[in-house]
Swiss-Prot record:
Highest taxon above the source species: Viruses
SUPFAM superfamilies listed in its UniProt record: Ribbon-helix-helix
One Pfam family cited in the UniProt record for this chain: RHH_1
One GO term (biological process): regulation of DNA-templated transcription
InterPro entries for this protein: Arc_rbn_hlx_hlx, CopG, Ribbon_hlx_hlx
Originating species: Acidianus filamentous virus 1 (isolate United States/Yellowstone) (AFV-1)
Record's protein name: Uncharacterized protein ORF59b
Length: 59
């Protein structure tokens, strides 16, 4: 895996740490899952839009 560095404010870091502790995960695991879920959700939205356009074209 490659390393990526970025800055977060104290409030976000506190939320991240609380979530990680509650779920027994590391910060990195929480961040990876959050990014994966966000990207997956966005791609699914795009797929739904494409599917709707294709359905309209078929009719």
């Amino acid at each position: 895996m490659r390393k990526v560095a970025f800055k977060v404010n104290e409030d976000l870091l506190e939320l991240l740490d609380k979530y990680a502790i509650k779920h027994g995960l590391s910060r990195s695991e929480v961040i990876r899952e959050a990014i994966k879920n966000m990207v997956k959700e966005e791609l699914e939205k795009d797929s739904i839009i494409v599917a709707r356009v294709e359905k309209i074209r078929i009719w």
